[in-house]
């Protein structure tokens, strides 16, 4: 028996083929079809007559498949096993039936665990990797593997297993040991809990043996546990580190060795472990030298650990008497270890740290404080209080030390906030013909540092000119250009290729701006902080590629901006060599489709690491900048040394764009220029704008007229009367807004002719 199907494409044929006798026949038919196509062409052979069809045999179940169906599998174990058997028989369609039923049944975690225990992880990984049974194959695999992972990490179950290590029945002890081995790193904390409890000392030897058996799986948790306040636990952990030759623990063990009294358990365990790890234990006077040297090594920019593709490493902290796993950039992990070593050194040493070490210690503390709060979140009052005893000169030195090093930007930001908290405006005084460290921070290549420095200076509230005052305004102005857009500037003299790429860029959610190169490229790259990255053709017009890149990198607005150099396949290797020294410039082949562009865009956006500023954060920063500018504009006499007039064009552009309209309107109202008043009136009269924006513009215009006088021309004023008179058919809200504009116009002009160019407050009647 056969049924008629619409003619399939060649790519659809494999999905119609199955196993068994019918499958073999279908495969033969496919071979014949391909041979026919190759000899006579697809149109004459497959499209005969007005309704071309082809006869395809129905897939007939083989005896094995029939038997498999008849077994009627029900449990997750039975269904998963039956699905794999169906795959082995070449029937992906039947496997999908079984797996779909498994998902639809919604089994409990216990049933999924039973399937995992009996079939193993590899069984479900095959489901995940088999393209013929997607997406249900991946869904089943994820559910089963998630249930297994949750079971393995269940702390209550693991705690019971640790207690079972002390059972009198050797079989039960062996079972507990096997289960803990399968739990891997998750077994560490329950074992640590026992080792920290003096009342369970009888179980300590077995717990230590279990840690030794776990070996490399718990290297990270062991390092974290060395921070514990429990000497009982620390002594046991040190013993384990020595037994498994955990060389990465050597530095931390030396620190604990230096802190421990000579006759303590920790000192004895550390001495033995250091002999096992390094061949000998250091003398007491050598401990300080060792810690000083190792801390300096960890604070160097060179990586001490092998990172993953994202530049991160697995790191374990000791928090609330537990080892907690996290992932950190390599340098952040190094800073945390250096901070531990320097902290130990401070406790051990009878004398203060040398100035150089004290500076490094402060840098580490600032870095960690900022990382803990978040790069875009101000330090808490508690954190700032921790730096209150630190002298201003030490904080300034730390800031100056951090500025040239990209990896220390969190420390630089924290230093600016700590300096601002001191509230001493003398921090801005120029010394030895050099600007203050805060003023130097305004010239940083990184937006976060520049903005933090500007906000810190404004918090100090200077009332007279200082070195860097113009840079504060430039920083606020550029920050205020954000509108939450995601702009990609494409520089390519080949118009057709650039247009194609722009279409791809727009499809995936970015806003393309196409230029051929030269001055247009620099203008668009500098225009707004919303530019997320640049795509520059190797054949860019204007300055040659290498000069173009140099110019962009020397300007602080684009110094850290990701740049993709679009190259031909033949020249790609050359461009890779040319850009190898700049980790934020990547050579790439011009993408031809969305998938290729998304892959390359992800690479580019990963290159700045944590210094990448998202569209949401840019918009939040713009609000901060506008608030600061509003304060300066509102108190013009107090802050007369700030020249706000150059900001007018930027603010007018922002008002037209519609982002942060309320904040921009406020600043323009305080600025009180003719162009500002005209723009406020135009936006307030625009019925397509949201009502809150229009009301904000009316309020700002009213304030501007009251403080600066009416600066509109006669024609502009008469236009507002025409608008009001023509608003009979408009809504009540619009009529109210237009009436408020007239109220503001008429307040200072009563009894004055409209042909007067402007009416200043001092000339009013």
Language model: regions and residue ranges:
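Conserved phosphotransfer microenvironments
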Residues: 533-554, 559-560, 566-575
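Short hydrophobic/Thr-rich beta-strand motif most characteristic of the beta2 strand and flanking loop
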Residues: 509-517
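Conserved acidic segment of CheY-like receiver
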Residues: 484-506, 534
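Output/docking surface of receiver
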Residues: 516, 566-610
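Short coil/linker segments at helix-helix boundaries
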Residues: 111-114, 118-123, 293-344, 369-396, ...
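Acidic, metal-coordinating helix/loop segments flanking the phosphotransfer/catalytic sites
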Residues: 516-533
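Structural detector for internal amphipathic alpha-helices that build alpha-solenoid repeat scaffolds
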Residues: 81-88, 97-101, 114-118, 130-132, ...
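Amphipathic alpha-helical scaffolding segments comprising HEAT/armadillo-like alpha-solenoid repeats
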Residues: 96, 108-115, 152-163, 185-196, ...
């Amino acid at each position: 028996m056969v049924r008629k199907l619409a003619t399939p494409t060649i790519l659809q044929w494999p999905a119609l083929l199955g196993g068994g006798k019918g499958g073999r026949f279908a495969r033969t038919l496919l071979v014949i079809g391909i041979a026919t196509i190759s000899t006579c062409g697809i149109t004459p052979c497959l499209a005969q007559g007005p309704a071309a069809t082809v006869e395809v045999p129905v897939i007939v179940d083989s005896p094995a498949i029939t038997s498999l169906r008849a077994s009627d599998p029900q449990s997750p174990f039975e269904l998963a096993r039956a699905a794999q058997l169906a795959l082995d028989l070449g029937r992906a369609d039947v496997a999908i039936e079984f797996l779909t039923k498994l998902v639809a049944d919604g089994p409990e975690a216990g049933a999924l665990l039973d399937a995992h225990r009996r079939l193993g992880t590899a069984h479900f990984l095959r489901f995940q990797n088999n393209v013929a049974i997607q997406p249900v194959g991946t869904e089943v695999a994820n559910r089963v593997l998630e249930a297994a992972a949750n079971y393995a990490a269940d702390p209550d179950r693991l705690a019971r297993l640790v207690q079972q290590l002390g059972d009198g029945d050797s079989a039960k002890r062996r079972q507990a040991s096997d289960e803990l081995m399968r739990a891997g790193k998750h077994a560490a904390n329950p074992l640590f809990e026992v080792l920290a409890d003096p009342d369970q000392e009888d179980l300590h030897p077995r717990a230590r043996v279990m840690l030794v058996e776990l070996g490399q799986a718990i290297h990270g948790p062991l390092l974290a546990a060395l921070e514990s306040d429990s000497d009982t636990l620390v002594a046991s952990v040190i013993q384990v580190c020595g037994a498994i030759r955990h060389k990465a623990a050597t530095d931390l063990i030396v620190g604990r060795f230096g802190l421990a009294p000579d006759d303590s358990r920790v000192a004895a365990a550390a001495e033995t472990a250091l002999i096992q790890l390094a061949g000998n234990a250091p003398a007491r006077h050598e401990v300080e030298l060792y810690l000083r040297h190792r801390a300096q090594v960890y604070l160097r920019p060179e990586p001490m650990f092998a990172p993953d593709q994202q530049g991160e490493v697995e790191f374990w902290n000791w928090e609330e008497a537990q080892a907690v796993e996290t992932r950190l950039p390599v340098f952040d992990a190094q800073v945390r270890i250096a901070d531990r070593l320097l902290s130990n050194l401070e406790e051990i040493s009878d004398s203060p740290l040398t100035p150089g070490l004290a500076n490094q210690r402060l840098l580490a503390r600032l870095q960690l404080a900022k990382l803990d709060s978040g790069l875009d979140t101000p330090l808490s009052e508690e954190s700032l209080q921790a730096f209150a005893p630190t002298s201003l000169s030490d904080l300034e030195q730390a800031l100056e030390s951090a500025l040239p090093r990209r990896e220390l930007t969190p420390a630089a930001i924290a230093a600016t906030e700590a300096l601002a908290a001191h509230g001493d405006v003398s921090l801005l005084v120029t010394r030895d013909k050099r600007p203050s460290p805060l003023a130097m921070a305004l010239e940083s290549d990184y937006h976060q540092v520049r903005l933090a420095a500007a906000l810190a200076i404004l918090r100090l509230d200077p009332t007279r000119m200082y070195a860097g005052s113009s840079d504060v305004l430039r920083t606020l102005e550029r920050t205020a250009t954000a509108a939450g857009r995601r702009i990609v500037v494409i520089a390519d003299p080949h118009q057709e290729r650039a247009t194609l790429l722009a279409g791809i860029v727009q499809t995936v959610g970015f806003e393309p701006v196409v230029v051929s190169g030269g001055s247009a490229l620099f203008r668009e790259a500098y225009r707004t902080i919303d530019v997320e990255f640049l795509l520059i053709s190797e054949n860019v017009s204007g300055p040659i590629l290498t000069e173009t890149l140099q110019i962009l990198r020397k300007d602080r607005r684009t110094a850290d901006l990701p740049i993709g150099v679009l190259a031909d396949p033949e020249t790609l290797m050359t461009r890779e060599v040319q850009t190898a020294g700049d980790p934020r410039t990547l050579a790439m082949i011009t993408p031809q489709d969305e998938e290729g562009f998304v892959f390359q865009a992800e690479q580019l956006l990963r290159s700045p690491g944590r210094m990448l500023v998202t569209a949401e954060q840019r918009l939040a920063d713009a609000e901060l900048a506008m608030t600061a500018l509003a304060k300066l504009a509102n108190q013009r006499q107090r802050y007369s040394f700030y020249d706000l007039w150059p900001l007018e064009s930027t603010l007018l552009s922002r008002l037209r764009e519609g982002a942060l309209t309320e904040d921009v309107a406020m600043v323009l109202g305080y600025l009180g220029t003719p162009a500002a008043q005209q723009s406020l009136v135009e936006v307030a009269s625009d019925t397509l704008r949201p009502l809150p924006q229009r009301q904000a513009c009316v309020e700002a215009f009213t304030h501007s007229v009251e403080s600066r006088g009416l600066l509109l021309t006669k024609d502009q004023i008469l236009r507002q009367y025409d608008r009001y008179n023509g608003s009979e058919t408009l809504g009540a809200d619009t009529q109210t807004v237009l009436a408020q504009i007239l109220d503001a116009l008429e307040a200072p002009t009563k009894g004055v002719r409209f042909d007067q160019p402007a009416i200043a407050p001092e000339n009013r009647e």
